[in-house]
């Protein structure tokens, strides 16, 4: 029977016929190695500072309680589950274009590095089984760009705490990621700038009770299942120089959407988005940011293909609902608008209800078209509204 490589065995790596390069504090393995076990405790005891494995099959990865090795797995197959709960990772931790065949679990672990170049990356990876990052703490840049999650992914109660002062610097990226099963992001704190642009959620996704304290982008994202942002806070208190801080522009929602009691404390963009099913903004609040009281929330050119609820909303900042197409019933009852609202050139194809709402500032329905019932019962306008060239057919 073929024996393990004696040299690598000294470093806690059990493999056969591996092409390797071993320097003073570096180990590299490449080109179709079959690795039975990697033991990080032994590697660290041997003084290894950097481990790079490329195009290999790996069965067992055994991390140490504290891991300070710079790690890069490049185009590898990870064939056994990874159990890495309650561990500390102090250095670069990269899996690039890897395929994980079984569960990975980094719950309750802590990722912390001291410089921008040393980050956590699972870029372009494929996860064939469940992924767990429950209560994981990230104090570094995190990259899941263009990765595919074929089963459930759970980040509940995780914290993304890294903050850079540079404008447009993405600190947490799920750009172009694909979620084929349910995704859970409950009770998360994002102090980092995060980007889900061009991501595809093919099943349910939940961001309930999550805090976005920095810039957040969902531009050109596709939500194919139920999407829940209930009780989520979009604070965007970090990176105040960033022009667009909360972005859902050109986004497609195919199933029911919940923004119930969500709070937007900075300008939010929904322009050119499409809601193909019911959407619920009941009890939401749109506030003026602390550093720009002239901001305007933008729902320009949005298409609502089913019923939409905006009841009991407080608009503390101006909102554009211009050039929208409302195909289902629209409910904007009991809203309080303290700033200007613009609905000009919008098309209401079904019933719309503004019952008992209070518009404390200017509101424009200029050139709107109401095909059915438009109910303004009990509405109070503190300033003269603009209905010029509006058409009422109901």
Q: For the regions a protein language model found, what residue spans apply to each?
A:
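N-terminal leader/targeting and pre-domain segments
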Residues: 1-394
